Amino acid sequence: MEAQYRNHDGDTSFSSLRVYLNSLSDTPSRFSRRAVSVSTSYDEMSRVRAVSGEQMRRTLRWYDLIGLGIGGMIGAGVFVTTGRASRLYAGPSIVVSYAIAGLCALLSAFCYTEFAVHLPVAGGAFSYIRITFGEFPAFITGANLIMDYVLSNAAVSRGFTAYLGSAFGISTSEWRFIVSGLPNGFNEIDPIAVIVVLAVTFVICYSTRESSKVNMVLTALHIAFIVFVIVMGFSKGDVKNLTRPDNPENPSGFFPFGVSGVFNGAAMVYLSYIGYDAVSTMAEEVKDPVKDIPMGISGSVAIVIVLYCLMAISMSMLLPYDLIDAEAPYSAAFSKSEGWEWVTRVVGIGASFGILTSLIVAMLGQARYMCVIGRSRVVPIWFAKVHPKTSTPVNASAFLGIFTAVLALFTDLNVLLNLVSIGTLFVFYMVANAVIFRRYVTVGYTEPWPTLSFLCLFSITSILFTLVWQLAPSGPPKWFILGASTVTAIAIVQIFHCVVPQARIPEFWGVPLMPWTPCVSIFLNIFLLGSLDAPSYIRFGFFSGLVVLVYVFYSVHASYDAEGDGSLDFKDVESLERINRVLS
């Protein structure tokens, strides 16, 4: 068994059908050995990283990260989300919703920042969860995150066709054609979306530094168009619209839907801040991770908060909230005003730039996730290779780019959008839990059960709050349960904070107000997960089931073989001492 276990090719289990069948019979023991096996920070930055062959060049600075963060967050969706949340949930107080959502996004970004500073590798959340909870949880979350990236990128690229048509006054149908033999939802061919995806794929394969430069130019143009729309909104707007609806029978005031409306609006617009997580995957290519990563991630979120709040105020001043078009607020508002119809095309141009920037950042991120998952051997090692000339993960970039292009060619936008979001929120939830666990538990030295019990109790309390908020009818019983849940959650955090000491204090940068900051992030992500529809959970369950099958029939055996040949083993005493210095 030991001879079979050790093979320098790393694929002993797949050398023949007979050997593979024998390996399957040993799946339970291999699963128990590998599923919760944690890597170390030093291994991730040295031995595992070396699997790629070449190193990714460290060419990025803090301003590159800020540009990538802004480009990843501010896509075309902001032109729609603001109007929808204002009309349906918050009214003029949508600016408060954006501020609350932005603060919560900043708290979640802090969790990513602590990990990225102390573990500057390209794996992002996959690596963070792998060194905390083990290989199997990391693979489940990483695979779902990559699928969400691919699906959202395909949807965004098809949206580019629509906004480009709006900018030039051309109907989308003139750029797409119908194939009668294909089923509905998959029969509208979009060649422009394919061209855009393949062009972005070429750029990110060629050079990360050049990709950053392209993103900086497009982001600057996009921000210029956003500022233009904001100025137009303020100049044409009326302060009275912040408190008076068009129909006197509708609720009035700055908070027409009350506090609940503000928080419901915050839950909707929070997704507009998603994108900063992709910046963490660039950590391996940052010149000075300790200084540049905190400035890049936090700085980009702060700038986006300001832009979103200004857009929300200008939108609320432009029209009474009950006249806002939920689907195309800015375009509809300006098109109804004599002499201002041309602004509609400006919105289309700005949205087109936003789509390109979000596509560049997301495709950079998805390729680096796949690259590091390949390094861990749970997918073929081919994905881990870094090209010696470009210093980019060309194999992962090209494969995912082609896959995205195929989806964008055939699949309708609505079909894609119904499959996106839950995976990203789930990963945010896992990272917030992981940063607490890493602070309070040192494997082999600290008892993990107090921390695990705390995380479970806090999550259960947050789930109870979310279910009551979503399902219970309004009235005193609902508010009593919500209040009791809030008090219980606060008490749980305070008791944990007082009773359980931190096992590790970050040397360079750490999440402030531990454990309160990540706990707010945990609660928010559970709250947002509770607002998603049933098809989202069905998709998540179905795809997660497929991921489990892949892990059972392939990944656990490939990982087991890699452990046998020493790729994932760790026994060097000198290296152990270096780990202690890194993690102290």
Curated annotation (Swiss-Prot):
Annotated function: Permease involved in the transport of the cationic amino acids.
Predominant place of localization: plastid
This protein's UniProt keywords: Amino-acid transport, Chloroplast, Membrane, Plastid, Transit peptide, Transmembrane, Transmembrane helix, Transport
Membrane topology summary: Multi-pass membrane protein
Family per similarity comment: Belongs to the amino acid-polyamine-organocation (APC) superfamily. Cationic amino acid transporter (CAT) (TC 2.A.3.3) family.
Keyword rRNA-binding in record: no
Subcellular location: Plastid, Chloroplast membrane
Transmembrane segments: 62-82, 90-110, 131-151, 185-205, 214-234, 254-274, 293-313, 346-366, 396-416, 417-437, 449-469, 480-500, 508-528, 540-560
Transit peptide stretch: 1-49
Keyword Transmembrane helix found: yes
GO molecular function: transmembrane transporter activity
One GO BP: amino acid transport
Cellular component GO terms, alphabetical: chloroplast membrane
Name of the protein: Cationic amino acid transporter 7, chloroplastic
